[in-house]
């Protein structure tokens, strides 16, 4: 597999310089073709993946809804910078086939009924709050939950529910953006709905958005 990192990717609008690649983010079963600056067709293998780091300040560009629809937004946790004196464990090469077997999108084999019930309750909440998911995003979330729930271990909540919580946090909540008291009221109602579904990680994100928005002239947004 090949992993390409776009560091500080939103210093310029990503749709300007990455538009040819964004077209390939649509789900497909075969390798795609892009035409770059040399005008020659370039075949893109299935094994190529992009990761991007972004910053949020006055020097960066916002991410478009079109881009967010095709990406999973992962917020890195704050960690203590403690020097690790133990030697790093050497990990050998991992084949694409093995990666797909463990981490590729999967249908939910267990708790399918519970996940379906969660979906039926969540979708009206999202739509009522103005978050409209494309069929692509719904497929990606379902595939993620199927893969993650087979890897996660049950803890304070079932593995499938924790996986669904991560999916909502990464695919739905980045779309939150709005201003004013009326939007805040809807956001509080949305938070209560997430809490009733047991999506505690997503609730924490909404709480953070509410706190920051209250201190930023009622401007509530994920980024």
Regions inferred by a protein language model and the residue ranges of each:
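C-terminal regulatory/interaction module of P-loop NTP-utilizing enzymes
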Residues: 1-223
């Amino acid at each position: 597999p090949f992993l390409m990192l776009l560091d500080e990717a939103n210093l310029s609008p990503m749709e300007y310089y990455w538009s040819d690649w964004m077209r390939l983010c649509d789900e497909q079963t075969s390798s795609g073709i892009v035409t770059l600056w040399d005008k020659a067709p370039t075949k893109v293998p299935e094994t190529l993946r992009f990761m991007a780091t972004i910053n949020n300040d006055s020097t960066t560009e916002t991410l478009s809804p079109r881009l967010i629809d095709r990406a999973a937004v992962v917020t890195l946790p704050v960690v203590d910078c403690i020097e690790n004196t133990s030697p790093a464990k050497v990990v050998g090469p991992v084949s694409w086939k093995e990666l797909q077997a463990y981490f590729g999108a999967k249908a939910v084999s267990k708790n399918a009924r519970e996940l379906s019930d969660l979906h039926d309750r969540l979708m009206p909440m999202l739509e009522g709050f103005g978050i409209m998911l494309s069929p692509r995003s719904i497929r990606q979330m379902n595939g993620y939950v199927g893969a993650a729930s087979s890897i996660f271990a049950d803890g304070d909540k079932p593995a499938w529910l924790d996986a669904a919580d991560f999916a909502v946090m990464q695919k739905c909540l980045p779309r939150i953006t709005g201003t004013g008291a009326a939007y805040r009221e809807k956001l509080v109602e949305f938070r209560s709905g997430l809490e009733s579904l047991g999506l505690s990680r997503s609730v924490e994100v909404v709480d953070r958005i509410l706190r920051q928005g209250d201190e930023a002239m009622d401007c509530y947004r994920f980024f």
